[in-house]
């Protein structure tokens, strides 16, 4: 007989209605997206019969049963116990059970005494689910494929004992989910393919033991996911392929042990991601192929001991990524082929104990501030000019910086910074010393020239630069002529142009007067070049001498330039030759 046409929603797409109900059976029709998927028959069991079995310490087997308004709080009143007294259940089984209540389905402050507790394939419909401070004993706990419906789910301060805990494919409905301060014991813990609803999910201050922790392919909803201050124990931790939804994700102050932490292929959605003060332990940390969305990302004061941290092929949105005072430990740091085309990333007060791979696919801005580098920082990009903005300040380099100055466009990136010329000069000086150590002498020369230019500009304001003649003398003699001693070819060309220029003045300016009486040279042009050359190179006239004051003073000027430029050329050439 059909008792009810009313349809009750379990989740967004799943609903049910009771077709038949009596003291023996309950027949329920399940629908998905308004299509009938199953009609299932349950055995009806009176709630007070369950209470009697618990009180008599009999086995409680609710498998394939319809259970209505079950509440251990009501049971305590029924037997006259205090509301905080622990309820002991000798043996318990609830496979494919249908729990329903208009208020709470209450298993709070219960202790299961057998070695295995099973709720597999059960449904908690309509009511809120409360396992607050439950103790699951020493055995395995199975909530595989459980559907928790629309209400909140509370496993706060639960003790799961020493066995394995499994919530694989569990659907936590649409309400708030709480596992805060839960103790998961030393077994493996699995939430693989679990689905959390729209509300807040809280694992704060929970404790995992020696086993592995699995959240692979789990899906979270629209609110904050809180793993703050969680102890993930000594095993491996897997969050691979998790979708964290739209809310913030908080792992702040959590601790990982000896195992690896795998966040590969995770989608962090639209919220902020917080790993501040996280201790990642001794294992590797994998963020390979992660999508971080548009929220800000914080790793401030995080700690890695021995493992590497890997962001290869990761994708970042319109966000800021902060690594402040991070202790990176002995492992490598990898960002190769990661996409930060709309993201800003900043490292400050960090020590790089091992290699760092900054070969981004693209990056909007990279800021390195107060960094100590002990090994290799790699900027040898596969793509041309992937960085749009770059700055490092107070970098202490004990290792090496692998970079191609031209290919990476670092020179232009530093020059266009909105910082002082002194800060720019310091950056070029670090690069100059680094290239010298690596034997990249062409890059060293280029960095040195930029260092001297920024150092020169730092001594003058924009206004005084234009008016100060000493500034322009330095620009012309040291920069334009020989690029601060890095280009002997330029100095040589300047020497030749100087000789020809003065020869032209001796030849064509009327006031110039030179005595060629003792010379056997008859060609006037050759005479002028000869006089200019010996004046420039030797300051000795021999058979030719100036005949008036203007010519004599011009010869003095050329002689001085000759001494200066020849010395400049010698120093520049020898510097190149010795290297």
What do the predicted segments below correspond to?
Residues 39, 420, 433-436, 490, ...:
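Generic alpha-helical structural element
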Residues 461, 479, 483-491, 556-559, ...:
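Membrane-interface junctions
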Residues 94, 107, 469, 473, ...:
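Alpha-helical structural motif
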Residues 444, 505, 573:
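Hydrophobic, well-ordered secondary-structure elements that form the walls
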Residues 1-473:
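N-terminal leader/targeting and pre-domain segments
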Residues 465-508:
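Transmembrane alpha-helical segments and their cytosolic interface motifs
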Residues 517-579:
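Pore domain of cation channels
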Residues 493-530, 550:
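Outer-pore turret/helix-boundary of cation channels
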């Amino acid at each position: 007989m059909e008792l009810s046409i009313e349809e009750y929603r379990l989740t967004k797409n799943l609903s049910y209605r009771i077709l038949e109900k009596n003291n023996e059976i309950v027949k329920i029709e399940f629908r998905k997206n308004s299509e009938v998927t199953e009609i299932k028959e349950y055995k009806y069991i009176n709630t007070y019969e369950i209470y009697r079995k618990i009180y008599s310490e009999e086995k409680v087997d609710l498998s394939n049963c319809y259970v209505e308004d079950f509440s251990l709080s009501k049971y305590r009143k029924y037997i006259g116990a205090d509301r905080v007294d622990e309820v002991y259940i000798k043996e318990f089984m609830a496979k494919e059970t249908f729990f329903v209540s208009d208020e709470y389905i209450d298993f709070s402050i219960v202790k299961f005494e057998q070695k295995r507790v099973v709720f597999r394939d059960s449904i908690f419909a309509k009511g809120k689910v409360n396992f607050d401070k439950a103790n699951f004993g020493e055995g395995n706990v199975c909530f595989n494929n459980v559907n928790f419906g629309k209400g909140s789910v509370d496993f706060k301060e639960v003790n799961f004992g020493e066995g394995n805990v499994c919530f694989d494919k569990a659907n936590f409905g649409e309400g708030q989910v709480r596992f805060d301060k839960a103790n998961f014991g030393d077994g493996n813990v699995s939430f693989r393919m679990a689905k959390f609803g729209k509300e807040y999910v809280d694992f704060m201050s929970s404790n995992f033991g020696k086993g592995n922790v699995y959240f692979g392919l789990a899906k979270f909803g629209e609110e904050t996911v809180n793993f703050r201050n969680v102890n993930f124990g000594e095993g491996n931790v897997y969050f691979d392929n998790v979708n964290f939804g739209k809310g913030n994700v908080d792992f702040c102050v959590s601790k990982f042990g000896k195992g690896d932490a795998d966040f590969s292929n995770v989608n962090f959605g639209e919220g902020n991601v917080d790993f501040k003060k996280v201790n990642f332990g001794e294992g590797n940390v994998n963020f390979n192929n992660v999508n971080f969305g548009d929220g800000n990302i914080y790793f401030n004061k995080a700690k890695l001991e021995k493992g590497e941290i890997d962001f290869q092929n990761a994708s970042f949105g319109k966000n800021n990524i902060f690594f402040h005072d991070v202790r990176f430990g002995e492992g490598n740091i990898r960002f190769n082929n990661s996409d930060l085309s709309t993201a800003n990333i900043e490292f400050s007060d960090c020590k790089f104990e091992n290699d760092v791979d900054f070969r981004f696919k693209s990056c909007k801005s990279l800021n390195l501030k107060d960094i100590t580098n002990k090994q290799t920082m790699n900027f040898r990009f596969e793509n041309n000019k992937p960085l749009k903005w770059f700055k490092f300040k107070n970098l202490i380099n004990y290792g090496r910086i692998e970079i191609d100055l031209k290919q990476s466009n670092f020179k232009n990136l530093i020059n266009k910074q909105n910082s002082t010329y002194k800060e720019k000069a310091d950056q070029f000086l670090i690069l100059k010393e680094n290239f010298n150590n690596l034997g990249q002498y062409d890059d060293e020369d280029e960095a040195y020239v930029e260092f001297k230019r920024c150092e020169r500009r730092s001594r003058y304001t924009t206004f005084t630069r234009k008016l100060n003649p000493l500034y322009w003398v330095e620009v012309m003699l040291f920069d334009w002529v020989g690029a601060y001693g890095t280009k002997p070819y330029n100095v040589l060309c300047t020497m030749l142009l100087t000789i020809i220029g003065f020869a032209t003045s001796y030849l064509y300016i009327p006031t110039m007067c030179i005595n060629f009486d003792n010379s056997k040279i008859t060609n006037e042009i050759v005479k002028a070049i000869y006089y200019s050359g010996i004046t420039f190179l030797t300051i000795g006239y021999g058979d030719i001498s100036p005949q008036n004051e203007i010519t004599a003073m011009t010869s003095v000027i050329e002689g001085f330039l000759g001494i200066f430029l020849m010395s400049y050329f010698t120093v520049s050439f020898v510097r190149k030759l010795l290297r």
